[in-house]
Amino acid sequence: MAKTSMKAREAKRAQLVAKYAEKRLALKAIISSPATSEEDRWDAVLKLQALPRDSSAARQRNRCNQTGRPHGFLRKFGLSRIKLREATMRGEVPGLRKASW
C-alpha cells in the first residue's frame, strides 16, 4: 500500500493540472504559432516556465484506486494488476474471467 503522503501528492498534482490547464494551453498555442513574433514567443516561454512545475500533466502518475500502487496500473479499470486479479476472481468485474483454453 502506498504511503498516504504519496497519494496526497498525486491529488495535489491533479488539482494543479486542472487549475492551470487553460493557461498552459494558451501559452503553448502562442509559442507554437508561426505568426507570433519572437518577442511575444519569448515572453510566453518565460511565463510558461514561471508556472508551478507540478502543473504539467506529464508529472502525474497513474495509481491504483484501492492501494495507490504506481506500477502495473491498468487504465481501463483504474486498478493495479494485483487488485484487478483479486476482483476478477471474486467475480466483481463484469465480462472478465480467468482465461481457459
Curated annotation (Swiss-Prot):
GO terms for molecular function: rRNA binding; structural constituent of ribosome. One of its GO terms (biological process) is translation. InterPro entries: Ribosomal_uS14 (IPR001209), Ribosomal_uS14_bac/plastid (IPR023036), Ribosomal_uS14_CS (IPR018271). Gene3D superfamilies: 1.10.287.1480. GO terms for cellular component: cytoplasm; small ribosomal subunit. Pfam families: Ribosomal_S14. Keywords: Ribonucleoprotein, Ribosomal protein, RNA-binding, rRNA-binding. It comes from the Bacteria. Part of the 30S ribosomal subunit. Contacts proteins S3 and S10. Binds 16S rRNA, required for the assembly of 30S particles and may also be responsible for determining the conformation of the 16S rRNA at the A site. NCBIfam families: PRK08881.1. Belongs to the universal ribosomal protein uS14 family. This is Small ribosomal subunit protein uS14. It comes from Shewanella frigidimarina (strain NCIMB 400). The lineage of its organism: Bacteria, Pseudomonadati, Pseudomonadota, Gammaproteobacteria, Alteromonadales. The gene is rpsN.
